[in-house]
């Protein structure tokens, strides 16, 4: 399944179990958080380059743990300070690749954590995220979202005591 969201002059393509997907040239470690708020709403961000909604997070940089990256990236991209409370899972499916706007083809390798908000108000950073919001589960269907992210949301909402692996 291919997900292409075009905004302005940039295009980002996400492929999820798509026979037309390009071959990845790099594995990109990333960390994201699933934060639930009153009424079961989820913290989501809207990416500037694709227009798609996803959990806040980003790349793990040299010298930091996945948990540190998740906390850092969530504060930057969503304006919310979080405390990691558990692991939803590791999402390492080699059939999930993204061709970024610069042409790099990345195999996704993502850690998704449960977290709770401990400060801040949702807002985009205007560089990577145009918006951040608490979104009701009932409103998720109408949002532009990559297929892999939809599966991550399903896992995050399942409250399975065993983390997803794969």
Task: Give the location of each predicted region.
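Conserved Nudix-box catalytic region and its N-terminal flanking loop in Nudix hydrolases
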Residues: 37-77
């Amino acid at each position: 399944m291919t997900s292409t969201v075009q905004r302005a002059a940039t295009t980002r393509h996400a492929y999820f179990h798509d026979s037309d997907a390009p071959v990845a040239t790099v594995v990109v470690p990333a960390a994201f958080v699933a934060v639930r708020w009153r009424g079961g709403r989820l913290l989501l961000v809207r990416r500037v380059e694709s227009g798609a909604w996803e959990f806040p997070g980003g790349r793990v940089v040299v010298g930091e743990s996945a948990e540190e990256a998740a906390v850092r990236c969530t504060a930057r991209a969503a304006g919310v300070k979080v405390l990691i409370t558990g692991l939803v899972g590791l999402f390492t499916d080699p059939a999930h690749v993204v061709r970024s706007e610069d042409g790099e083809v990345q195999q996704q390798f993502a850690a998704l954590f449960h977290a709770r908000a401990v400060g801040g108000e949702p807002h985009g950073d205007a560089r990577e995220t145009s918006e951040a919001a608490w979104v009701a589960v009932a409103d998720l269907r109408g949002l532009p979202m990559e297929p892999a992210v939809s599966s991550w949301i399903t896992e995050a909402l399942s409250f399975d005591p065993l983390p997803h692996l794969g």
